[in-house]
Amino acid sequence: MPALETELAAERAHLDASREALRRMRERAEDLFATGDQVAGDPFAAETLGRTLARRIADLADNPDTPLFFGRLDIEKHEYHVGRRHVTDTAGEPMVLDWRAPLSRRFYQASAADPQDVDVRRRFGFVKGELTSFEDEHLGRGEEQGTSQILLDEIERPRVGPMRDIVATIQPEQDALVRAEIDESVCVQGAPGTGNPNPGI
């Protein structure tokens, strides 16, 4: 099997393992929800716990058409998959980092000029939830690939229904806006249809 196919198979295996870990996390939350009123001290605590766990269960729902991760960072011989939510294995070790996590910021901000200790930034291509391709940028060597075809394909993908999730396509300038302090006023300018509201949302 060629090296590219071997690497793609390994990433698909990680995706499958991450989906299984997410399923276990949801089952655990459902078990807690089922027994929550038995361990709560009073009716108010039981109701609060129930609402919190119901939100958690909804947050842990898996959509097989949506990839769990869209990128990977290789930093000091460690691989960190970056996605839309945090997923852990049974020992609590991260399998997928939430895109909002501090370490994930490097996925958006690192460059060949300022690699931020990132050796490789990998972007994944998906079709209906199936991992089909990847592109690597060797930032630690000072190599930047330029415009990513995977990124362009994601940006140009037809939009259907409500505003689409944009976390896989955030650019460095947008990332700075998304992570700005809440008490900071920001003005975003641009032509209609260019995604101006996205950082605010």
Q: Residue locations for each model-derived region?
A:
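The conserved Walker
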Residues: 192-193
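Walker A (P-loop) ATP-phosphate-binding motif of ABC ATPase nucleotide-binding domains
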Residues: 185
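Extended, charged low-complexity regulatory segments
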Residues: 1-167, 171-179
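Hydrophobic anchor at the beta1->P-loop junction of P-loop NTPases
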Residues: 188
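Motif I (Walker A/P-loop) of helicase-class P-loop NTPases
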Residues: 196-201
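Exposed loop/turn and edge beta-strand positions of beta-sandwich/beta-sheet ligand-binding modules
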Residues: 182
